[in-house]
A protein has these predicted regions:
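N-terminal capping segments
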Residues: 36-119
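Cysteine-nucleophile amide-bond enzymes
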Residues: 1-73, 210-214
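Alpha-helix initiation/capping motif
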Residues: 102, 129, 198-199
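Aromatic- and glycine-rich peptidoglycan recognition patches
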Residues: 2, 14-16, 25-41, 147, ...
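...with weaker cross-activation on analogous glycine-rich loops/strands in unrelated enzymes
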Residues: 116-190
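General helical structural elements
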Residues: 18-20, 77, 85, 195-197
Length: 214
């Protein structure tokens, strides 16, 4: 009996330690995330991936009338269709780099279509981040804010920030049917996907990068 009474405090002591440890973790983790941008970026990427996994994708590339589009826009749509069918790995568009590749996909398509972007930091055609991508289009007078009344055309690059559908993302406009956008994007659930925004969920849509038409 004495032995059982002596053991009771140890049990409660262990339980108390576990509770205190859990509380400490709950307090420490948010501080680490806030003070360590790289960790925050990785967590944001994981959250965005979950959002994308839940988004429906189309199994076929849509029919698009390109007759009245500029040659550059026609090339953009043609290249996007080819890559959608090929479903290549993201490293094809990122020059071999293992990284989030939605902006790399847009950069590669524009480069191959004869309307290359120019990274303000490296001078190269590839812009791997959506923030820099937007800055590039703005600096060159090619950015159309979402609230400007501009109606996007096939071949425009849509750019998002904290979108409930895409997170921080960019993809290419394929169609605009009375406000229902059909887009094709890289790194959507780690693949190239066609998405029809039937619910018109455009919260977080910053605007559009307009390609230089040759």
């Amino acid at each position: 009996m004495k032995h059982q009474q002596a053991a009771a405090p140890k049990f409660f002591s262990k339980k108390r330690c576990i509770i205190l440890s859990v509380i400490a973790l709950l307090l420490i983790v948010p501080i680490v995330v806030i003070t360590q941008p790289k960790i925050a970026d990785k967590l944001s990427f994981l959250i965005n991936s979950v959002r994308l996994d839940r988004s429906p994708g189309e199994s076929a590339f849509p029919d698009i009338d390109t007759a009245n589009l500029s040659p550059t826009r026609q090339k953009i749509i043609s290249l996007a269709k080819t890559e959608f069918k090929a479903q290549s790995a993201g490293t094809k568009f990122s020059q071999g780099a293992e990284e989030a590749w939605c902006a790399n996909f847009v950069s590669w398509i524009m480069y191959q279509a004869g309307a290359p972007l120019k990274n303000p930091h490296t001078g190269g055609w590839r812009i791997p981040g959506t923030f820099t991508l937007r800055e590039y289009y703005e600096a060159n007078g090619q950015f159309k804010p979402a609230n400007s009344g501009y109606q996007p055309l096939p071949g425009d690059a849509a750019i998002y920030r904290n979108s409930p559908v895409f997170g921080d993302h960019t993809n290419i406009v394929l169609k605009n049917d009375n406000g229902v956008l059909t887009t094709v994007g890289g790194n959507e659930a780690n693949r190239i996907r066609v998405f029809v925004n039937r619910d018109k969920q455009y919260d977080g849509l910053l605007g559009y990068g307009v390609p230089t038409d040759n």
